Amino acid sequence: MLILTRRVGETLVIGDEVTVTVLGIKGNQVRIGVNAPKEISIHREEIYQRIKSEKSQQNLC
């Protein structure tokens, strides 16, 4: 895992098409903005896990 430090307003670039910008920090929460092409799905981890679980259950039926 790559670990980076960024300040509010600073951006990370992933590949040629994805950027992640730190928008704000309030207590222990960090607000980030993600710019990516529409064909790239972006989910919070808990939502992604739920989607995977639902797809897995559908495949069992």
Curated annotation (Swiss-Prot):
Main subcellular location: cytoplasm
Subcellular location: Cytoplasm
UniProt keyword terms in alphabetical order: Activator, Cytoplasm, Repressor, RNA-binding, Translation regulation
Keyword Lyase: no
InterPro entries membership: CsrA, CsrA_sf
GO biological process: mRNA catabolic process; negative regulation of translational initiation; positive regulation of translational initiation; regulation of carbohydrate metabolic process
Short name of any one Pfam family annotated for the protein: CsrA
GO cellular component: cytosol
Gene Ontology MF terms in the entry: mRNA 5'-UTR binding
Function: A key translational regulator that binds mRNA to regulate translation initiation and/or mRNA stability. Mediates global changes in gene expression, shifting from rapid growth to stress survival by linking envelope stress, the stringent response and the catabolite repression systems. Usually binds in the 5'-UTR; binding at or near the Shine-Dalgarno sequence prevents ribosome-binding, repressing translation, binding elsewhere in the 5'-UTR can activate translation and/or stabilize the mRNA. Its function is antagonized by small RNA(s).
Subunit structure: Homodimer; the beta-strands of each monomer intercalate to form a hydrophobic core, while the alpha-helices form wings that extend away from the core.
Family: Belongs to the CsrA/RsmA family.
Entry protein name: Translational regulator CsrA
Species assigned in the record: Blochmanniella pennsylvanica (strain BPEN)
Underlying gene: csrA
